[in-house]
Amino acid sequence: MNRDTKNNYSVFDTHCDTLCCVRDDGKSLNENDCHVDLKRMSEYKSYTQVFACFIDPIYKTCGAERTMNLTDTFHTHTQNLPQNVKAVLSIEGGEGIYSLSALRNYHRLGVKIAALTWNYSNHIASGALESDENRGLTDFGKTVVAEMNKIGMLIDVSHLNR
């Protein structure tokens, strides 16, 4: 699609892992070979991108630190967005949500959406790739969902098993 054609379209993309690429590989959000960059996004009439703080299973034991690092990356790289570009912050994988106060603090830092798992079980819920179809939300997971509803954080169910 050429630039003139793109100027006619508005995009709302609900997921990308670009924050991990920027954080881990030292890439620039301005222009990169990751999922999206500001240069490509600014070619559209309007572009809203949801940036995921993806908590890979290798970070399971330090999920909160990883979530905070990616949140910091988001804020560092989205301070001066082009006028037609909007950025939304999400969490993909609830390993960093170790308490309701942590959840509320992520919300205060701008997290608007959270996926409770990423395919595998954690302390909040069972994941999409798990065979235990009867597990669903844990007791803590139920309190997390209730708190998310209370504070207005959207629940992404795409990687849950039930």
Model-derived regions, located:
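Histidine/acidic residue-rich metal-binding segments in metalloenzymes
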Residues: 1, 100-108, 130-162
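N-terminal hydrophobic targeting/anchoring segments and the immediately downstream early-domain regions
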Residues: 1-133
